[in-house]
């Protein structure tokens, strides 16, 4: 998975409760 605050693309899987938004792994609201 991609660590928080790291760059990501599309539906990349971010670690923990984070989602790929605006090219970054951000917290899911």
Curated annotation (Swiss-Prot):
GO CC, one annotated term: extracellular region
Recorded GO terms, molecular function?
Answer: calcium channel regulator activity; toxin activity
Q: Where does it localize?
A: Secreted
The answer to whether the entry has keyword Disulfide bond is yes
Q: What is its main location?
A: secreted
Q: In which tissues is it expressed?
A: Expressed by the venom gland.
Disulfide bonds listed in the record: 1-15, 8-20, 14-25
Q: Which UniProt keywords apply?
A: Calcium channel impairing toxin, Disulfide bond, Ion channel impairing toxin, Knottin, Neurotoxin, Secreted, Toxin, Voltage-gated calcium channel impairing toxin
Could you tell me what this protein does? Answer: Binds reversibly and blocks P/Q-type voltage-gated calcium channels (Cav).
The UniProt similarity line reads:
Belongs to the venom Ptu1-like knottin family.
Q: According to its record, what is known about the domains?
A: The presence of a 'disulfide through disulfide knot' structurally defines this protein as a knottin.
- Name under which the protein is recorded: U-reduvitoxin-Pbi1a
Organism, scientific name: Platymeris biguttatus (Two-spotted assassin bug)
